[in-house]
Amino acid sequence: MFSLSFIVIAVIIIVALLILFSFVPIGLWISALAAGVHVGIGTLVGMRLRRVSPRKVIAPLIKAHKAGLALTTNQLESHYLAGGNVDRVVDANIAAQRADIDLPFERAAAIDLAGRDVLEAVQMSVNPKVIETPFIAGVAMNGIEVKAKARITVRANIARLVGGAGEETIIARVGEGIVSTIGSSKHHTEVLENPDNISKTVLSKGLDSGTAFEILSIDIADVDISKNIGADLQTEQALADKNIAQAKAEERRAMAVATEQEMKARVQEMHAKVVEAESEVPLAMAEALRSGNISVKDYYNLKNIEADTGMRNAINKRTDQSDDESPEH
């Protein structure tokens, strides 16, 4: 009986220990104690109840303690519950402390929650980053297109990381400055001879205002001549003028053809009126004979004159045709 009770008690103790070890990270608690970080088991149990991973809070806390940072469990747990990257923020604080950069934990946490890589920002403050722009094209006053590529050396401005514009804004502003500087050059050779003028002009405009960076230098890496935009525009304009002139000429030709057809129609109309009038002559002659306005003798004289006129016209027509067919001497 005694042995059975002992076995039951032993099983209960073992099960209780297994439950305890599975719910409370004893190994993590021992590691914290060994590192000099005093964390109560109750604190670890509370993290479990608040659905916080103890390792993601205690491990960065140990790292911060070893680096000499005075951080608390509540600070790290609050940042974790807010959705931040606790380990990244602690690494950024350690890097800032080593580089003698004033970066409180609250500011680092705010930068992290804003979606910025706070560790990269600290590293960029110590080691400036070089941003290379693509080829940016501008047209000088003489119509030649010039393409330039720039290297922008920037340093992160930690004070403006929250709410400040990013790299895309820096590239866009520098590109705008390059286009403006090339466009104000009277000749493209000025850009080729003095590319540093672009750097000086662009750098003097304070393009880093409102951004999360401080521009240290702008260097022109490459300058190329592209094409003669002015000549291309003149060619396109000449082609457009030619097409317009051709369209207007076609319009005038169509109007002339329409006018010609209209005149032919009017000629036919007049000819019809003449034929109609001629058809009324015999009737008028008959009426004149009946009324005695003309005599029969006058009528035959008129017919003789018409026949004589017709014969003369026929002779003249044959003469003209023979003259046209005779060879030239």
From Swiss-Prot:
An annotated GO cellular component: membrane raft
Keywords: Cell membrane, Membrane, Transmembrane, Transmembrane helix
Subcellular location: Cell membrane; Membrane raft
Pfam families, alphabetized: FloA (PF12127)
Transmembrane domains' residue ranges: 6-26, 27-47
Membrane topology: Multi-pass membrane protein
Superkingdom to which the source organism belongs: Bacteria
InterPro entries linked: FloA
Family note: Belongs to the flotillin-like FloA family.
Quaternary structure and interacting proteins, as annotated: Homooligomerizes.
Function (record text): Found in functional membrane microdomains (FMM) that may be equivalent to eukaryotic membrane rafts. FMMs are highly dynamic and increase in number as cells age. Flotillins are thought to be important factors in membrane fluidity.
Protein name: Flotillin-like protein FloA
Gene that specifies this protein: floA
